[in-house]
Amino acid sequence: MEIKVKNQYTADVAVIGGGTAGVFAAISAANTGAKTILIEKNSILGGTMTAAGVNFPGLFFAWGKKIIDGPCWKAVQRTIDLGGAVMPKISFKPERHWDEQINLNKFIYTAVLFKMCDEAGVQLICNSMVSGITETDKDLKILITEKTGMSSITAKKAIDATGDANLIQMAGYEVIKGKKQQPATLQNHISGYSMNDFSENEIRLKFAKENFPEYLTADNILHFLRIGKLDMHIPCSNADTSQGKTALEKQSYFNMLKVYMFLKSIKGLENLEIDYTAAETGVRESNRIAGEKTITAEEYINGFLYDDSVCYAFYPIDLHVMDGIKQKYHSENVVGKIPYGALIPKNSKHILCAGRCISSDIYANSAIRVEAVCMATGQAAGCAAALSAHTNTDVVALKYNKLCEALKKIGAVTDFE
């Protein structure tokens, strides 16, 4: 049976994935003068920050100084101005790094993203996924599946902001997946109880008789009750595939239901309810591209200054394992950087990467996967794709000084040191 292409779109830059990185890649490309189309699998923009409920991006400041700016910060500021967040106190050295993350109202932030895409002139198509790609010397033909059928996009450049490097993998470029991926988390909120309503000892005694996974302890259960959410690590492998993602979502709900029913059996917790769950489980790690440059943990934590740095990144190495978190912090006044080469799949002419799957080792990736950094890499990829499209230049041949000029024009920080 012949499959007919229903719609044929053209663009200078096609961005696949309208999540944490992709939405700012599209806005930045459009603001740099490119005709831009943005394809998003969900019904809303924002990805992990909205659909997965991780609505507390960070870190935009390091050692008391703003290190990430531009359209992504404007989106945060507009959300604050609309009453959708309260700006935390910024200090030289906060007691806890997450105190400087900004808790955003998901509804207001999503509306701001839609508005900013409209203002920039981005052509947005939601509820669609990439299904194929063909690359020539001069352009790309990308197939997407819309609700009404298959459509094509002819674009000069493309940005993979899927979080899983799906487009890059389809195009035949090398991606890397660790033997084990970091666990995922389904965001949620529980209510209907107080800490004085139950006996901790009863929880410990009953827990010992239950058949819970070995990575879940009675102390974990008590911690969930203190923070008001079932903050569980869910084993995650192959989240870059439909089958793997399906298995992950099922396991998230099964695990959460088991804990929920256990808690409901405890005297004093009969009225406990899960009153919010995110629309999808938040994935920390899947694929990473093999890039023109690869960020190592040593380079990242020591603030190595690349000759093609495009943004700062300030978050501790934050490797989640099933039974906890392994962290390592920057020394005082040290800030990590992201090189442009880490956004370029090795030997790519027309495709860039933005977000958590940029080229990095597993430990560096555990830090640069966080949301403010993903936003900043999106901005860098958007400007680079727009400039490369305008000058008919391979992405790897783009002049670094021109990229810095474009980033400065959109308000991004470029004074790297």
Give residue spans per PLM region.
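N-terminal Rossmann-fold NAD(P) dinucleotide-binding loop
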Residues: 22
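Flavin (FAD/FMN)-binding glycine-rich loop and adjacent Rossmann-like elements that form
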Residues: 48-50, 110, 150-157, 162-417
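Membrane-embedded transmembrane-helix bundle of lipid-linked glycan/lipid transferases
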Residues: 14-16, 25, 30
